């Protein structure tokens, strides 16, 4: 398997086309601000080499990979940004499950399930400019259910 020299760059939008962007050290999903279109955060992505590659385990970072999305190590999953270098996680031999998401491809969109908390997925709120968080997918989702499908496109 080839070893990456740096993280891959992706941009993420939810299926309602809200872009993921950073504000006050929080990852939010939104669109227009004062008539300016937000370009969206560059998301640094590396595979987690310690976990089963067939499950597409990925580690997601922001700010050039200097901070990574983590589900924490508490009793319940809490999504937060931790000041950990994405390449250290990539090159390290640890499982780093709290930083890992299984990317599930669903045609045009993908969902991201926490490796540390199975059944919990990255999601956005239907309202704009709310934090990205984790949710369990309900049996019969209501119209205002969290959005768990994302467009995941490599940066130009």
Swiss-Prot record:
GO terms for biological process: antifungal humoral response; inflammatory response; innate immune response; negative regulation of cytokine-mediated signaling pathway; negative regulation of interleukin-17 production; negative regulation of interleukin-6 production; negative regulation of type II interferon production. Belongs to the IL-1 family. GO terms for molecular function: cytokine activity; interleukin-1 receptor binding. This is Interleukin-36 receptor antagonist protein. The gene is Il36rn. It comes from Mus musculus (Mouse). It comes from the Eukaryota. Disruption phenotype: In combination with transgenic IL36A exacerbates skin abnormalities (acanthosis, hyperkeratosis, presence of a mixed inflammatory cell infiltrate and increased cytokine and chemokine expression). InterPro entries: IL-1_CS, IL-1_fam, IL-1RA/IL-36, IL1/FGF. Inhibits the activity of interleukin-36 (IL36A,IL36B and IL36G) by binding to receptor IL1RL2/IL-36R and preventing its association with the coreceptor IL1RAP for signaling. Part of the IL-36 signaling system that is thought to be present in epithelial barriers and to take part in local inflammatory response; similar to the IL-1 system with which it shares the coreceptor. Proposed to play a role in skin inflammation. May be involved in the innate immune response to fungal pathogens. May activate an anti-inflammatory signaling pathway by recruiting SIGIRR. Keywords: Cytokine, Cytoplasm, Disulfide bond, Immunity, Innate immunity, Secreted. Removal of N-terminal methionine is necessary for full antagonistic activity. Disulfide bonds join 9-155. Interacts with cargo receptor TMED10; the interaction mediates the translocation from the cytoplasm into the ERGIC (endoplasmic reticulum-Golgi intermediate compartment) and thereby secretion. Highly abundant in embryonic tissue and tissues containing epithelial cells. Its main location: cytoplasm. One of its GO terms (cellular component) is extracellular space. It is found in: Cytoplasm; Secreted. Bioactive (processed) recombinant IL36RN inhibits effects of IL-36 when used in 100- 1000-fold molar excess.
């Amino acid at each position: 398997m080839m070893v990456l020299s740096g993280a891959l760059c992706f941009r993420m939008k939810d299926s309602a086309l809200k872009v993921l962007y950073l504000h006050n050290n929080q990852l939010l999903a939104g669109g227009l601000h004062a008539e300016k279109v937000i370009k969206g955060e560059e998301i640094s992505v590396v595979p987690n080499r310690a976990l089963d590659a067939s499950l597409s385990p990925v580690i997601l970072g922001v700010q050039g990979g200097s901070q990574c999305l983590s589900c924490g190590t508490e009793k319940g999953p809490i999504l937060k940004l931790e000041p950990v270098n994405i390449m250290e996680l990539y090159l390290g031999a640890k499982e780093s499950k709290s930083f890992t998401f299984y990317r599930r491809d669903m045609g045009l969109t993908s969902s991201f399930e926490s490796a540390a908390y199975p059944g919990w997925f990255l999601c956005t709120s239907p309202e704009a400019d709310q934090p990205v968080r984790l949710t369990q997918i309900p049996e019969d989702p209501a119209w205002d259910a969290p959005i768990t499908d994302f467009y995941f496109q490599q940066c130009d």
